[in-house]
């Protein structure tokens, strides 16, 4: 599939990105290669092949959920100009 300027502009809008003019041709080429690769994948005959969700036999092993106190918050709050309890105190911005 050929990615043209119109398609690239649509993708820019959807992704909320701005591609610099000097990179537009390179992006169109790379996106075209990605779409071509997906087309190749779509041509694969996967009839009779069961979908695989995980490669770990028996699923993901669970661990016990143990709560423990951490000192990360206290360390971060030492850099706060203002704090209240375990929270940053910031100026009110919405009235």
UniProtKB/Swiss-Prot annotation:
Keywords: ATP-binding, Ligase, Nucleotide-binding, Protein biosynthesis
Gene3D superfamilies (UniProt xref): Glu-tRNAGln amidotransferase C subunit, N-terminal domain
Keyword Ion transport on entry: no
Keyword Nucleotide-binding found: yes
Catalytic activity: L-glutamyl-tRNA(Gln) + L-glutamine + ATP + H2O = L-glutaminyl-tRNA(Gln) + L-glutamate + ADP + phosphate + H(+); L-aspartyl-tRNA(Asn) + L-glutamine + ATP + H2O = L-asparaginyl-tRNA(Asn) + L-glutamate + ADP + phosphate + 2 H(+)
SUPFAM superfamilies on file: Glu-tRNAGln amidotransferase C subunit
GO biological process, one term: glutaminyl-tRNAGln biosynthesis via transamidation
EC number, as in UniProt: 6.3.5.-
GO molecular function: asparaginyl-tRNA synthase (glutamine-hydrolyzing) activity; ATP binding; glutaminyl-tRNA synthase (glutamine-hydrolyzing) activity
First-level EC class: ligase
NCBIfam families to which the protein is assigned, alphabetical: gatC
UniProt function note: Allows the formation of correctly charged Asn-tRNA(Asn) or Gln-tRNA(Gln) through the transamidation of misacylated Asp-tRNA(Asn) or Glu-tRNA(Gln) in organisms which lack either or both of asparaginyl-tRNA or glutaminyl-tRNA synthetases. The reaction takes place in the presence of glutamine and ATP through an activated phospho-Asp-tRNA(Asn) or phospho-Glu-tRNA(Gln).
Subunit details: Heterotrimer of A, B and C subunits.
Protein family according to the UniProt entry: Belongs to the GatC family.
Name under which the protein is recorded: Aspartyl/glutamyl-tRNA(Asn/Gln) amidotransferase subunit C
Species annotation: Campylobacter fetus subsp. fetus (strain 82-40)
Gene assigned in the entry: gatC
């Amino acid at each position: 599939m050929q990615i043209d300027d119109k398609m690239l502009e649509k993708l820019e809008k959807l992704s909320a990105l701005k591609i610099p003019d000097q990179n537009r041709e390179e992006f169109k080429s790379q996106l075209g290669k990605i779409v071509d690769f997906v087309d190749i994948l779509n041509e694969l005959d996967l009839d009779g092949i069961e979908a695989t969700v995980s490669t770990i036999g028996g699923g993901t092993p669970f661990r016990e959920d143990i709560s423990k106190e951490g000192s990360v918050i206290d360390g971060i709050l030492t850099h706060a100009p203002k704090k209240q309890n375990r929270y940053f105190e910031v100026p009110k911005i919405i009235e």
